[in-house]
Amino acid sequence: MAALRLLLGIDYGTKQIGVAVGQAITGQARELCTLKAQNGVPDWDKVQALINEWKPDAIVVGLPLNMDGTPSDMSARAEKFSRKLNGRFGVTVYTHDERLTTFEAKGERMARGGQKGSYRDNPVDAIAAALLLQGWLDEHPELLNV
């Protein structure tokens, strides 16, 4: 397998999908944007635009597991979304345990100066995507081209 240089991270949700970008050279992930979704279905044209712009070597999708490590109700939907990304765009897709990333993202938002309004109006999904992608980068240095 070729070494990975640039990755997108996705925090999948039924109403919003957080997106982050990570680079092997820095080993760091950062938040990028939040996409709206209708019952878990994104605007695929916007997903295509992100892929065209960033040209990721792979995408990491958060896998929402229960605290005991078993699949949650959303796990199957996230895995189906991962397969659709691979099928539509031909990019390698990995899944990564995303337990507590939304909780951590809310804490990070508070540390940055607090939450302004509701999380619906000011979502933390892109922060959660960056956290899960950072976790994946930290756990898989052997796959990175550094």
Curated annotation (Swiss-Prot):
Q: Look up the domain of life of the source.
A: Bacteria
Which keywords belong to this entry? Cytoplasm, Hydrolase, Nuclease, Ribosome biogenesis
GO MF annotations, alphabetized: nuclease activity
**Keyword Nuclease among UniProt keywords:** yes
Q: Per its UniProt record, what SMART domains does this chain match?
A: YqgFc
Q: Which InterPro entries match?
A: RNaseH-like_sf, YqgF, YqgF/RNaseH-like_dom, YqgF/RNaseH-like_dom_sf
On whether Disulfide bond is a keyword of this UniProt record, the answer is: no
Q: What does this protein do?
A: Could be a nuclease involved in processing of the 5'-end of pre-16S rRNA.
NCBIfam families named in the record: RNAse_H_YqgF (TIGR00250)
Question: In its UniProt entry, what is this protein called?
Answer: Putative pre-16S rRNA nuclease
